[in-house]
Amino acid sequence: MVLHSKVAIIGAGAVGASTAYALMFKNICTEIIIVDINPDIVQAQVLDLADAASVSNTPIRAGSAEEAGQSDIIVITAGAKQKEGEPRTKLIERNYRVLKNIIGGMQPIRSDAIILVVVNPVDILTHIAQTLSGLAPNQVIGSGTYLDTTRLRVHLGDIFDVNPQSIHAFVLGEHGDSQMIAWEAASIGGQPLTSFPEFAELDKKAISKAISGKAMEIIRLKGATFYGIGACAADLVHTIMLNRKSVHPVSVYVEKYGVTFSMPAKLGWRGVEKIYEVPLTEEEEALLLKSVEALKAVEYLS
């Protein structure tokens, strides 16, 4: 357990509860508090998680928005879900209002707090959260394409018969329709992925579609995704809290492009400590610029 490691999770839904559950068993938090506008949901989740906490050393309880604002790390999972046939702009409008209320309720937010946004559209909402909170851009991070990258590495691990943790490959850009895979920079054991005989046989478009479409397939079959993103959010908290200096693809403000989207970033106590520029082919750079254009076209980023 790390001294001064209080984590607040805003949102007691499936993603918030999954994040709390995954984080509990890392035994790095002095305390986890859960905050939600629905007191019954908070009580139910805390009671249920407290049973699991009996085999963990992490206290968990309900908390207030004001307490959340004084936590070391604030994980925002509360947000409206996209309705069937609803335009993306309408979802942004609804989640903007939710985010504005959340951040307003937490004020004053600790000047050294780290905010992790785990709500879609995550790139846009991370940008908005940074603006509303008044914190420095390096202190406000979105989950971005971390889960997409994990899915890609698992998929490639199956193809190349190697542990996914030994694969260095990234999904970059917007977490959404315009995200892209940096194939040229991908490697296994220091050897470029493009140099493997199997690479020539890869259907890269099919892989990209499978990675970006996996969430919708899960939603179609059971209504929502939460375990995977909860585990990823907990891992990001772990990385920051232990100052691990690990590199993950997360939503960050990238000055070169003038937008918030996913690039590999070194994470530690101060949040984002360094953003790494991935070598891309001309075709890949063009795809990344499509992400930039898609995000800049959104009214709330203007």
From Swiss-Prot:
InterPro entries assigned: L-lactate/malate_DH (IPR001557), L-lactate_DH (IPR011304), L-lactate_DH_AS (IPR018177), Lactate/malate_DH_C (IPR022383), Lactate/malate_DH_N (IPR001236), Lactate_DH/Glyco_Ohase_4_C (IPR015955), NAD(P)-bd_dom_sf (IPR036291)
One Pfam family matching this protein: Ldh_1_N
An MF annotation (GO) of this entry: L-lactate dehydrogenase activity
UniProt superkingdom: Eukaryota
Transmembrane intervals: none
Active site: H175
Catalytic activity: (S)-lactate + NAD(+) = pyruvate + NADH + H(+)
A GO BP entry: lactate metabolic process
Binding sites annotated in the UniProt record for NAD(+): N120
EC number(s) recorded for this UniProt protein: 1.1.1.27
Pathway membership, UniProt: Fermentation; pyruvate fermentation to lactate; (S)-lactate from pyruvate: step 1/1
GO CC annotation terms, alphabetical: cytoplasm
Binding site for substrate: R88, N120, R151
Assigned keywords, A-Z: Cytoplasm, NAD, Oxidoreductase
Compartment(s): Cytoplasm
Protein family (similarity comment): Belongs to the LDH/MDH superfamily. LDH family.
Quaternary organization: Homotetramer.
Function: Converts L-lactate to pyruvate.
Name by which UniProt lists this protein: L-lactate dehydrogenase B
Organism: Rhizopus oryzae (Mucormycosis agent)
Lineage per the UniProt record: Eukaryota, Fungi, Fungi incertae sedis, Mucoromycota, Mucoromycotina
Designated gene of the protein: LDHB
